[in-house]
Regions:
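Hydrophobic alpha-helical transmembrane segments and immediately flanking/interface helices
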Residues: 133-159
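Alpha-helical transmembrane segments and their immediate juxtamembrane boundary regions
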Residues: 23, 27-93, 157-186
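Cytosolic juxtamembrane N-terminal segments of multi-pass membrane proteins
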Residues: 10-29, 147-149
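Generic structural signal of hydrophobic/aromatic residues within well-ordered alpha-helices
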Residues: 50, 121-125, 139
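Inner-leaflet juxtamembrane helices
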Residues: 69-125
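Short, flexible segments with low predicted structural confidence
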Residues: 2-5, 10-11, 54, 65-67, ...
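Short, highly charged low-complexity linear segments
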Residues: 87, 106, 110, 138-148, ...
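Short, charged cytosolic
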Residues: 1-20, 126-142
Length: 186
């Protein structure tokens, strides 16, 4: 097979490349999850404070209604995007022996094997170990899909941060406008 992995000299450099790339992907995923956790905490705290302190004051001061609703909506939307960035997507979890024999599955991702019998999983891993093309192809595919998941996480996080940042500015401006341009209730 021309151009196959078997023809290449797969030394320490290639192993280091895969190891480093995997580590980088895992670290970036951890960073994204930490950022999402921070946004979850901040927005949950703001929502709690607003609901406990501002919402009860709205009947006595109508000027608080619109800015409070804006702030709650912003925090809720940011919260949803933070949750979306951490929400796992798990596949069916069962690769067949035929999938393995045809090299159509990736046993390196738990979502592809968690419902398989141990014997079938073991057989599949042994098949992969015996075939370096299958092994490196699986590792490459795994890295690719890790990258796809990371891109989605960071896309949701970017939206979360933008909603929070710009929404906070709009909410503060709404509070300022409400108190500067509308008279206080009597």
């Amino acid at each position: 097979m021309k151009g196959s992995m078997k023809e290449l000299n797969l030394g320490r450099g290639v192993e280091t490349m895969y190891r480093t790339t995997y580590r980088t992907h895992v670290n970036l995923s951890s960073i994204a999850d930490n950022k999402a956790n921070i946004m979850l905490s901040i927005n949950a705290i703001i929502i709690s404070i607003v609901v406990a302190n501002l919402v009860p004051k709205i009947p006595g001061d109508y000027r608080l209604a619109v800015p409070t609703l804006i702030l709650l909506a912003v925090c809720l939307i940011a919260l949803v995007y933070a949750i979306l960035s951490t929400r796992p997507k798990v596949t069916q979890g069962r690769a067949t022996r035929e999938d393995i024999a045809q090299k159509r599955t990736n046993l390196l991702f738990f979502g592809n094997f968690y419902r398989m019998d141990l014997a079938d999983f073991h057989w599949g891993m042994m098949e992969m170990i015996k075939d370096s093309d299958f092994l490196y192809s699986s590792m490459t595919r795994d890295l690719y899909y890790l990258g796809v998941v990371l891109a989605k996480k960071y896309q949701y996080l970017r939206i979360c941060y933008n909603v929070f940042m710009y929404g906070l500015i709009v909410a503060v401006a709404a509070f300022a406008a409400a108190f500067l341009f509308w008279p206080a209730p009597v």
